[in-house]
């Protein structure tokens, strides 16, 4: 979800799109990473 990506962006102080590129992130990957 966008909410999860937003939390990631806040946590790492990076733009959401940059995080998605770095992680190759889809929601499941991001959620696993946050949990």
Curated annotation (Swiss-Prot):
Antenna. Keywords: Pheromone response, Pheromone-binding, Transport. GO terms for biological process: response to pheromone. GO terms for molecular function: pheromone binding. Homodimer. This major soluble protein in olfactory sensilla of male moths might serve to solubilize the extremely hydrophobic pheromone molecules and to transport pheromone through the aqueous lymph to receptors located on olfactory cilia. Belongs to the PBP/GOBP family. This is Pheromone-binding protein 2. It comes from Lymantria dispar.
